[in-house]
Each structure stands twice: as C-alpha cells, then as structure tokens.
Amino acid sequence: MLPHGAAAADEPAAAAGPPQGAAAFEEEVIFRADLEEGYACFRIPAVVSTTEGTLLAFAEGRRDNCDDAGDIDVVLKRSFDNGRSWEPLRLVAEGGGDTHGNPAPVVDATTGRILLVTTRNPGQGGGNCPAPCERIPHLQYSDDDGATWSEPRDIREQLRPDDWNSWYATGPLHGIQLASGTHRGRLVVSVNAETYAGGRVTHNHGALAYSDDGGENWQLGAVDTWPIAADGTFRQKPSEMAVAELPGGRVYVNSREQDGTDLGHRNYAVSHDGGESFAAPFVTQPDLYTPQVQGSLLRLGDDRLLLAAPADPDRRRTMMIRSSWDGGVTFDAADRGAVVTTDWSGYSDMVLIPGGTGTVGLMYEAGPVDARDEIRFARFTEDWLGPRAGPGPSTPDLAPGAGPAAVTGSVGTAAGRFGAGAAFDGGGDGVRLPFRDELPLGAGDFTVSLWFRYSVGTGEHPFLWMGGVGGRAPQVWVRGEPGNGRVRALMTAVEGGAAPASAEVVTDGAFNDGEWHHLALTRAGGRLSLSVDGGAAVSVPEAPGTVSRTSTFGVHLGQRPDDRLRLVGALDEVRVYDRALTAAELAALRESNAEPGGGNAVTRLPLDEIGAGGS
C-alpha cells in the first residue's frame, strides 16, 4: 500500500460482471468483513501457488477500520482445489495494535519453502502513517504448505539502507523465482522507499531485492532513485512494483506511478542481470489507462504478459486484464482489454492455477459501493481473454511523423464539410490517437480547429479530448452541451508545486441545429479563446502552466478517454497546432480548408476515410 487513500466512491458504478466468455470465467468472494469475526476491512491481496499445488491467498486484515495505519494483521486462506473453495482464515502475523502488511510472498520451487516479506510500522489508530514513517521489513517462512509460519524476523540490516527512513514498502504482491538464465533459482521481490532529510522527503527509490540461498539472506539489487525538488515536484515515483520473468531470465518490473511530473500512471524498467541492476531508468507509459493504483503481472506462455489493473484513467473501477506482446513495452488499449468487472476495484494479484491448463487466478479488491468492500478470487482461461487482436480500423493522421489513428466502435462516414466526415452514434464510437511525444501541448500556445455537427437536445458530447480525466488532471477538451445551451471548452494546467487550476470558455448557444459549424480554440498571450464560425471570440485568462503533466494522456475524438461521455453527431477536419494561428490562418481554414504556412500541426485528421490499418 501507499500512504494515500483509495478513490472515493461518490458516484454509482455500472453493473458488475464480465461481459464476454462467462462460461470460461468464475469467481467468488474470499475476504469480506461480514464473513469474518474481528475485522472491519480486508485489503492488499497477494497470492501464490505452492509446490504441492495449494493456493495461498494473503491479505491485510484491518481490525478497526479500513485506514492504512491502524491495527492490521497479515492473514491467509488456503485452497486445495484450485481456488474453488477456501479453508477458514489463518493469522500469519498479528498487528497487536500496530500495522503489519504489504505481503510479498514467493515460493522456492527447489525446497518448497514459502517466504513472506512484509513491513511493520507503529499503528496510528487510523489514517495514514505520517512522514517520516518508520517502516521495517520482516521475513517469515513456512515449510508445511502454509499451515504454520515462523515468527517474523527483522531484516532491515539487509534490505533497508539507513537513509530509506521515511516510507518503505514491500510488494505488495507475489515475488518470483527465476526459472532460466544465469541466475536460475534466484528469488526476487520488489521494494519502494523514500528518504527524509531537512524536514521533508528528498528522494524516491524503486528497488529489487533478491536471495540466492532460498530466502535465508537477502540483498538489495537494482535501485532507481529520483530526487524531489524543494517545491515537492519530482519526475517519477515508481511504487508498488509488480515483477515478472521474461524469456532468458530478464526481470520485468511494472509499477504504479504516484504524482510524478512525467506523463502516465504506470512505468516500467527491465533488469538483464537477475535484478542486480536496471538496464535503464524507469519509463512512463502515458497511454496505459489506469488510476493511481497498484497493478499485478503474470506471464502467460513465452510471448504474452498480463497486467491486471482498473482501466479507468481517473477512478478505481473497471478491473481489466490487458495483454502485452512486446515484453511489457506496450499493453492493449482499454477498448481491447478483457473486463473482469465494472464495479469499483483496486489492488490485485495473479497466479497460474496448477494443473497445466493455463487457467489464471485473479485475486482483487472490488465492490458495488467501494473498491474496498471485499476481496474476490476469479478464475479464467486464455480462451476467455481471447487471442491477440489484429489491426483494427483506422483513419489517417496527416501530421508530420504521425501514424494512423485507431477507430473504435461503429464510427461511420458521413458527408463532411470538406469531403467526408466521421459519424458517431454514441454507442462507444471513438477515434483514438496512438501516443507520440509531439502530442502533449505542454505550457505553450496552441490552436484547435475542427468542424462539428449534431442535433441532439441533451447530454454532453465530446468533440476533442486531450490529456487526462478528472478535476485535477491536466487536460484540454471541447464539447457540446445542448441541455445547457452552449459549447464549452476547458483547460486544466499545473505550474510547479501549485495545485492544478482550470479555465473554461462557453459560447452563447449550443449550435445543435444539424448544420456544420467551425470551432476554433486558442491559447495565446495568457488567454484562452473560443469562437464558432468566425464570430467574436469568448476569451478568459488562461490557467497557468502545463496542460500535459502527471496524468494519463490520451487524444480522443467523439468520446472522453474513460468512454463515459460520447458524441452523437459528426466531426470533420480535426486539427491541433502547437502555436496560436492568426485570424487570417483560421479564416483560410474555415473558408477553404487551407493548411497554414509553416504547419506546426501535431495532429491533422481529415476523417475522409476509415479503413484497415494499424492501431
């Protein structure tokens, strides 16, 4: 866990349940407060399969409330039938008023011993452990298939340098034993920590720990450290790191990114020497949509790597399994993932079910009201996941260096303002641009130029969305709001260590008359301006700073990135420039579709054709 609360459940979730392949999917609740005496909440799942074929499901049993720094035990349930039934709860490490948690189990296949690395800190009665938080790593083991456990042993001398004195977390989820390569047999778990000095947190550390003697002794290996500026900003904070072995014994790490200025809520790194060092610093994955939350990994065969995490870019909901076919560099887009539930959902772990059938077990937090309501265990097959998807429909992006944009749903063609346009029926249609470094607009001037047509009388209809989702995420968007009688554009920006700020402009009228209208949105000279059909611009002071920081980043036409707002209407000639176009250039675009001299288009979508192509 991190010292941050779960996303609040202040709006209803959609109906729960996997929408496809139900026959190959089954699940049940294994931890919930009303099913167990003495606990108010269960969180932080971790699961492994022993050499005897037993599944061990660990969790934090929180006695008084669901807060992160209360009286918390590490608890366990075992399954002897591949997760179809579970024996009663066992106590592995008692909190006794303090916080014992962050379970990171790993199995030594040679000896059958199960190692469990955890952390301990003084209980606060509730809330979070304030910085500097004294958290100590401990080690336990079981030699009888998880039935009994050794007393926790303090291993700070091996795994916690003296200056990692603020936050320290193991896992929380399973570690791995390397099955190939030079370091075959090595046990590897993940750690993240912070340094506190001079009255503030000064550094973040993402690390791997390993053991070559069956877990008796441990040492720190790969470490990636990121400094924190005096204003509290930093580029990255790799946290709650999931590990998986790639072919050849390489160690792949995918982590939660927590509030760094680099774009994205996930980042990754790779070790080529069994976890002793990282080949390069962590790299963020801006268009891998998740909220800020822990996620889990499982390698399925030689070429498929699974990621389990909520797929909403802002909120903890819609648990999804996404596949990577390139060793974790990229994962499926959210519109191509396998939905486990549309309920609120949070932390998770995965395990390969014994028996050689390729069945995957997913242990995850979820609930109809809050992601912390219960912990479920799901079983699914690769048939339920589906095979690797081929290239989908696309539409050309004529901006320099751009590839085609993916077309999702049933986007159709319509008579456009210049040539053909794209028609959206509100049923999940959209156009999604693949991430390129040129797309984020940063703190500079920009211009959005597009044609829109719609005739509906209610709802919120996105024309273009660039950036993240939510009140604090940097973003730029423009949409029609016919029920409010307006077209509305918004920018949210952040500068230095200040809180995000927003500026919005609205038109007098929704222009929902079923005719084509030209829209121009410009950031220039410290102002945000919006005009329709060349009329007088509505202008307000801009929100200072960058519109491209910290959050996930996506560019979508016809839908919000979380697909919870959709356009019923049509778009044509959508262009974005990384400068402010002049009035004459905008007039030429509006009147003759003439490309401005000097270009500077970061995206240029004629929307004249939709056909086969890469996505």
Model regions: which residues?
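Secretory targeting and sorting signals
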Residues: M1-E11
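Extracellular glycan-associated modules
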Residues: P3, P393-S615
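Polybasic, low-complexity, intrinsically disordered segments
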Residues: E11-Q20, Q475, R486-R488
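Asp-box/BNR beta-propeller blade signature and adjacent active/binding-site loops
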Residues: G17-G392
